[in-house]
């Protein structure tokens, strides 16, 4: 993964679709390496929303009024991801919601970075939440709003964790994941 490429962090929020409440994309946020928002839109998923999952997703019926259609949003998002290192937490769910093959992208996933886990003194865990990593390494609390998660907040947090991982790698003489401005 070494080399020079632009880095973008992504986080998506999903709602339940149909009788089985399968995940459908309802919001996507992208930020650059400096935390500036590149993309943040509510997205009208294909099909009937049967569970807004507001407590977690932060998405309400009002957000769907005038929301960008899934097909349009998907093209916009994939264009922004093209050729970049994509940073996120448990990205497989985001790419599934985008109906996109994650293997077509170069990714950095905070949920699988053992260097971060060790730095946070969590190397005994099987799975680490973004909230716990942020508490331990960024010394800040996220995902604690009664209104649900913010995909912008989560994307910014994963970008900060990526930068911590880069510093750990540099300190230990390990190859960096990507070099960006």
From Swiss-Prot:
The organism's place on the tree of life at top rank: Eukaryota
pH note: Optimum pH is 7.0.
Compartments reported by the entry: Nucleus; Nucleus, Nucleolus; Cytoplasm; Nucleus, Cajal body
Keywords in alphabetical order: Antiviral defense, Cytoplasm, Exonuclease, Hydrolase, Immunity, Innate immunity, Manganese, Metal-binding, Nuclease, Nucleus, RNA-binding, rRNA processing
Chief location category: nucleus
Positions that bind Mn(2+) 1: 11, 13, 154
Broad enzyme group: hydrolase
UniProt EC number: 3.1.13.1
Note describing how the cofactor binds: Binds 2 manganese ions per subunit.
InterPro entries membership: Exonuclease_RNaseT/DNA_pol3, REXO1/3/4-like, RNaseH-like_sf, RNaseH_sf
Cofactor: Mn(2+)
Residues binding Mn(2+) 2: 90, 93
Oligomeric form and interacting partners: Associates with PML and SP100 in the PML NB complex. Associates with survival motor neuron protein (SMN)-containing macromolecular nuclear complexes and U1 and U2 snRNAs and U3 snoRNA.
Name of protein: Interferon-stimulated gene 20 kDa protein
Annotated source species: Sus scrofa
């Amino acid at each position: 993964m070494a080399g020079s490429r632009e880095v973008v962090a992504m986080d998506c929020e999903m709602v339940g679709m149909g009788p089985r409440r399968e995940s459908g994309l309802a919001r996507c946020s992208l930020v650059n390496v400096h935390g500036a928002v590149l993309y943040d839109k509510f997205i009208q998923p294909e099909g009937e929303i049967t569970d807004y999952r507001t407590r977690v997703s932060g998405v309400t019926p009002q957000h769907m009024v005038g929301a960008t259609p899934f097909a349009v949003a998907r093209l916009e998002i994939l264009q922004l991801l093209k050729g970049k290192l994509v940073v996120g937490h448990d990205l497989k769910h985001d790419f599934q919601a985008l109906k996109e093959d994650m293997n077509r992208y170069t990714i950095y996933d905070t949920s699988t970075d053992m260097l971060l886990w060790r730095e946070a003194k969590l190397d005994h865990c099987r799975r680490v939440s973004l909230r716990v990593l942020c508490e331990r390494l960024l010394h800040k609390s996220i995902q604690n709003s009664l209104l649900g998660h913010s995909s912008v907040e989560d994307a910014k947090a994963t970008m900060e964790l990526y930068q911590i991982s880069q510093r750990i790698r540099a300190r230990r003489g390990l190859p960096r994941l990507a070099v960006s401005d």
